[in-house]
Amino acid sequence: MDIFKYDVYRGPNIGIYTSANDEKIFLPRGFAKAKAARLEGYLGAEALYTSVANTRLMGTLMVLNNSGIIMPSTISEIEYEFYKKHTDLNVVVLDTKFTALGNMISVNDRGGVVSPVFPREEVRIIADALGIEVIQRRIAGYNQVGAMMVATSGGGIIHPETDGEDVKRISEVMGVHMEPATINGGIPFVSSGLLANKKSVVAGSFTSGPEIMMLTRAFAG
C-alpha cells in the first residue's frame, strides 16, 4: 500500500474537500486539473468535478463505498442527477435533519459505524443503500463517528483514545483491523486529513514520519 502526502487549498485537510471509492474521486468544481491528475495517479481512480449542496465539502457531506452514495437532503436536483449519470452507484438521499453525513457515518464495503443520534429507520436505509451491516456507537466519546475513523477494504485508522473494546467491535464490523492513530501532526479527527481506497492512501501534508509509519501498518492488508 502506497502512502502519499498532499494538500488541498493550501492546507492539509484533504478529507474535508474530497471523497473517493475504488473507481471515482469526487472533487469540487474548479479543482486544479494538475492536482486532480496526481490524485488520479495515486488512487487509480477517475476524477469527477461536482458539488454537494452547492458547496465543495465533499468529504464532510457525503458517504460512499463501492456500492452506493448517501447524500444529505440539501443536495440539489442537478447534483443528484449528476451522480446518477456519472456513476453506477446507488444514489440515496437521506431524509434526515443531519447534513454533515460524512462526519456522522463511516463505511467500507464490509460494514459501517453510524452515529447513535440517527433513528433506527434511517440506520436501516443507510445499511440497505450501501449493502452493508452497520452498528451505532460513539467513538472516543464523540457522536461524530465519521470524523473519528477511516476504513478501506485493506485496513483502517481510528481516534487514538477509542476504548479497546470499541476498537475490537468496530474492527469486526468493518472486516479489517482498525489501528488507533493520528493525522497531520497529531490531529485525532482522522477523516479530515485522509483520502483512501484499495490502492493507496493520501494523507494531509502535515502528516509526520511516525504517522506515515502508522498508516503503512494500518493499511497493510
UniProtKB/Swiss-Prot annotation:
The keyword Acyltransferase does not apply. This is Translation initiation factor 6. One of its GO terms (biological process) is cytosolic ribosome assembly. The lineage of its organism: Archaea, Nitrososphaerota, Candidatus Cenarchaeales, Candidatus Cenarchaeaceae, Candidatus Cenarchaeum. Disulfide bonds: none annotated. Binds to the 50S ribosomal subunit and prevents its association with the 30S ribosomal subunit to form the 70S initiation complex. SUPFAM superfamilies: Pentein. The gene is eif6. One of its GO terms (molecular function) is ribosome binding. Belongs to the eIF-6 family. Gene3D superfamilies: L-arginine/glycine Amidinotransferase, Chain A. Keywords: Initiation factor, Protein biosynthesis. The keyword Protein biosynthesis applies. InterPro entries: eIF6. It comes from Cenarchaeum symbiosum (strain A).
